[in-house]
Amino acid sequence: MNDKVYNNDCENSCCYKTTIVYNESNNKTSKSSYTGATHTRFEHSLGVYRVALLILKRLAHDERFAALVRAEEAETLILAALLHDVGHFPFCHLLEDLKLPGLIRHEEAAASYLLGELAPTIRADWNVDPEDVCAVLGKRAPKRRPTDSDAEYSRREIVFRLLASILSGPIDVDKTDYLLRDSCAAGVPYGKNYDVERLVGSVCLNERGDGIAISTKGKTAAELMVFARYVMFSEVYWHHASRSATVMFQRAVDLIAQDVPTERLIADFRRLSDAEIAAYLLQLTRPANSPSTCNSAENSPFLADATLADAGFNDFADFNDETAPRSPADARRRDARRLLLGLFGPERRLFKRVRQFSVLEEPTLYPRLAGRPYFELREISERFAASLGVPGRLLVDAPPVDKEVEFKIDVFYPEENVYRPLATVSPVVRALAQEQFDDYVKRVRVFAAPEVASTLRLIPDFNARFARAVDEFEADARR
């Protein structure tokens, strides 16, 4: 299997058999790792597997690591790297933010695959306990075995913390691959401008021995990786067009979920590909008198060979602005269809930025919005849109609390035999990860439909009226 990102082959018989099962069982449905790019989670998983092998090869020369970690535990890390995304499905993170009833998080879905249909392959080809793989992926302590002494179980707890830090942490195998891969696939240079080989070559154990650190050799490479992640967030992941598409898609699914049983919606999302989901959602939003409309668990289709052309773009004429919806359900379908056609239709029509601000620009309003769950932002959006006379045509996007440019890793100075936090020895990292990221990348944005955006931008007291909508929401929430 040739990997275009690293320009080399990834070959191993156990890896090959496991990935065949993995790809056939789950990841064939999840095409895009980043929605605007053209690559798959399957490719990404092979890349993470490759980086994990490189780090293990490096750490094999570390005396403390060699004395601590057993061969089967190293195999557990390799398998966890290969299967770390097995629970994902198309648009997974966007849907999880909606908190739909019955939707289990991708971590739980991964455990069901690992302990279910993948378990025989894992045991036969890897001689690894699937529960240990789940523990590493979930950053949990391993299950205590009947033969474990107190000392042995204590050692295993340390090992599993170490393995989890290699897979998911400030500098880990997942980020190392997705920054490069997303950058290549999206056609931008930002995620490629750091020295992966030098960074991997500097990896060592931290002072406690339960996580990774880097030596001074990798300090500059680590700084450049932090910078790469900062710029990728600024110019790709949280670019205003990306965020507009995100909130439009979430709102469309939210509207549909009010009329379609969520258990069927979730089941169909798990088995459909990206393109099939687009066609499926468009069919769900056809007018009520359309014979292909499906609004119940019994007639919700599995569109194995669906195309966007099958979804009836011409039916949008039934939802023109002059036609009053016959029911609240009609209105929801109309609004959802507008959003979906803006995303997946013949001509892209994303909602436009009307306002955006950081915590520096709006120190009072910003913290009242940042970190709010989706359903609260939806309620605020609806109130604000109604107050401006544009119901259904305004969406609020605010940064979540769990996204940061992580940098909490130590740098080892062998000449002095001391460890120092990267943020302490690198003002560049501190400025990027705290000041620049928090102050400039993490912005609150208000998007509006293209036909009303220009008018809304001219409202002189826009932010004050926005604040009043938040006031009203908070007052009602306290009642």
Segments and roles (model prediction):
Residues 1-78, 86-479:
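Histidine-centered, transition-metal-coordinating active-site segments
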Residues 83:
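Aromatic-lined, polymer-binding surfaces characteristic
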